């Protein structure tokens, strides 16, 4: 208890003030200068040169539009001879910061609403009506069960459903991809950026790009790094994947546009940098529900006025355009803050040297005696002398 009171009394009634002591020691002097040089190197090299601590920064605000071009031809028993242009394989026509290119499909033509046998699987195969439930439906059903067991073909019976008939059979994905020629389609990406804090705007179609150049150029990281037109096959290849393999079941590709701009330099130095990566990277050891697909339908009426539709299960590659970056420009406030922080860090050298001199060196008691001078309360000493 007495020890606690002594510590509390020392804390409340004692005051220490810095005392400058010049210590002639090569070790301590050299260590002090080395620490100071390291701190200066950090402040100048890292904070100001590398991180540009003298600049105010702002994040990019971006808008993106895309346009695909390319024509393909197919000739199949189901669809016959057919030409595919942009209006056929870009579904939907417009998306926000992305574009879907259909590369493969399962087409079910001339569907009408009625009753028909379900596709055979472990839940739909039956022997009699007793195996089928009226009104049954689950997430994998093509329609609503009628309770009847009907022939699917000469050897198999399945439960009948009320649905769009004939029901879709998506058991096998076409290989190779139906629109494998999409590898040579091109994609124009138009990107406008704005840094609101500095009221600076620019677009990826640079001022030196002419109309004739834009009609003929294709992006190449070495020869045409600022051409905004990309060949789809090259995008996938630059990400380290095969377009023909990806086109079968689809996937998602990221086109990354990086804008890092130093606005203390001329605006012509603010340039886009493109990179590519697959966003739905496949795990070969756990390949469940791979790729990217969805369904859409085209509705029409036959000569008798009955509604029909053609259902398409579309597989393809969705290209997501991801824009990021920051801009910096000189500002006195962050400059002074970082200068002040650097000066404060120089005090670390003094603290470190004090710890070594006063607690680690052989002559620490001698140095401690020179460093600290203990002075009694002058008023108490004076009153004691008067009482005597």
UniProtKB/Swiss-Prot annotation:
CTP binds at residues 67, 69, 186, 293, 295, 313. It holds the Pfam family P2X_receptor. The chain crosses the membrane at residues 34-54, 339-359. It is found in: Cell membrane; Lysosome membrane. GO terms for cellular component: apical part of cell; lysosomal membrane; plasma membrane; postsynapse. GO terms for biological process: calcium ion transmembrane transport; calcium ion transport; cellular response to ATP; cellular response to zinc ion; excitatory postsynaptic potential; nitric oxide biosynthetic process; vasodilation. Gene3D superfamilies: atp-gated p2x4 ion channel, atp-gated p2x4 ion channel domain. It catalyses: K(+)(in) = K(+)(out); Na(+)(in) = Na(+)(out); Ca(2+)(in) = Ca(2+)(out). PROSITE patterns: P2X_RECEPTOR. Residues 55-338 are extracellular. Disruption phenotype: Mutant T-cells show decreased Ca(2+) microdomains directly in the initial period after TCR stimulation. In macrophages, an attenuation of P2X7-induced cell death is observed correlated with altered cleavage of caspase-1/CASP1 and a decrease in IL-1beta production. It is a multi-pass membrane protein. Disulfide bonds join 116-165, 126-149, 132-159, 217-227, 261-270. Keywords: ATP-binding, Cell membrane, Disulfide bond, Glycoprotein, Ion channel, Ion transport, Ligand-gated ion channel, Lysosome, Membrane, Nucleotide-binding, Receptor, Transmembrane, Transmembrane helix, Transport. ATP binds at residues 67, 69, 186, 188, 293, 295, 313. GO terms for molecular function: ATP binding; ATP-gated ion channel activity; extracellularly ATP-gated monoatomic cation channel activity; ligand-gated monoatomic cation channel activity; purinergic nucleotide receptor activity. InterPro entries: P2X4_purnocptor, P2X_extracellular_dom_sf, P2X_purnocptor, P2X_RECEPTOR_CS. Its main location: membrane. Glycans are attached at residues 75, 110, 131, 153, 184, 199, 208. Residues 1-33, 360-388 are cytoplasmic. Activated by ATP. pH-dependent and inhibited by acidic pH. Induction: By immediate ATP release following TCR stimulation. Functional P2RXs are organized as homomeric and heteromeric trimers. Functional P2XRs are organized as homomeric and heteromeric trimers. Forms heterotrimer with P2RX1. Interacts with P2RX7 (via C-terminus); this interaction is functional only in the presence of ATP. Forms heterotrimer with P2RX4; functional differences between homomeric P2RX4 and P2RX4/6 heterotrimer are minor. Interacts with AP1M2. Belongs to the P2X receptor family. ATP-gated nonselective transmembrane cation channel permeable to potassium, sodium and calcium. CTP, but not GTP or UTP, functions as a weak affinity agonist for P2RX4. Activated by extracellularly released ATP, it plays multiple role in immunity and central nervous system physiology. Plays a key role in initial steps of T-cell activation and Ca(2+) microdomain formation. Also participates in basal T-cell activity without TCR/CD3 stimulation. Promotes the differentiation and activation of Th17 cells via expression of retinoic acid-related orphan receptor C/RORC. This is P2X purinoceptor 4. It comes from Mus musculus.
């Amino acid at each position: 208890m007495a020890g606690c009171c002594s510590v509390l009394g020392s804390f409340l009634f004692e005051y220490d003030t810095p005392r400058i002591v010049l210590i002639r020691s090569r070790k301590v002097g050299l260590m002090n200068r080395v620490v100071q040089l390291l701190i200066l190197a950090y402040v100048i090299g890292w904070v100001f040169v590398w991180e540009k601590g003298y600049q105010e920064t702002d994040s990019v605000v971006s808008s993106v539009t895309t346009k695909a071009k390319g024509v393909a031809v197919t000739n199949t028993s189901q669809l016959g001879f057919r030409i595919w242009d942009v209006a056929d394989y870009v579904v939907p026509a417009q998306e926000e910061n992305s574009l879907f290119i259909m590369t493969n499909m399962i087409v079910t033509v001339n569907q009408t609403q009625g009753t028909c046998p379900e596709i055979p699987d472990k839940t739909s195969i039956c022997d009699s009506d007793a195996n089928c439930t009226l009104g049954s439906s689950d997430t994998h059903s093509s329609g609503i069960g009628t309770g009847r067991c009907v022939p699917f073909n000469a050897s198999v019976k399945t439960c009948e459903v009320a649905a769009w008939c004939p029901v879709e059979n998506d058991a096998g994905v076409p290989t190779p991809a139906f629109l494998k020629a999409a590898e040579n389609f091109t994609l124009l990406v138009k990107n406008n950026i704005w840094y609101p804090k500095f009221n600076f705007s620019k677009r990826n179609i640079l001022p030196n790009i002419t109309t004739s150049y834009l009609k003929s150029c294709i992006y190449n990281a070495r020869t045409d790094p600022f051409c905004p037109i990309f060949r789809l096959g090259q995008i996938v290849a630059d990400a380290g994947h095969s377009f023909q393999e990806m086109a079968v079941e689809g996937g998602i590709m990221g086109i990354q546009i990086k804008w890092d701009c130093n606005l203390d330099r001329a605006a012509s130095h603010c340039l886009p940098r493109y990179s590519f990566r697959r966003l739905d990277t496949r795990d070969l050891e756990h390949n469940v529900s791979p790729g990217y697909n969805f369904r859409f339908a085209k509705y029409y009426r036959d000569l008798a006025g009955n509604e029909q539709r053609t259902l398409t299960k579309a597989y393809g590659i969705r290209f997501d355009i991801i824009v990021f970056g920051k801009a910096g420009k000189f500002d006195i406030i962050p400059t002074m803050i970082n200068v002040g922080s650097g000066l404060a860090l120089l005090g670390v050298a003094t603290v470190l040297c004090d710890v070594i001199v006063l607690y680690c060196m052989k002559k620490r008691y001698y140095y401690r005696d020179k460093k600290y001078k203990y002075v009694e309360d002058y008023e108490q000493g004076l009153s004691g002398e008067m009482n005597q």
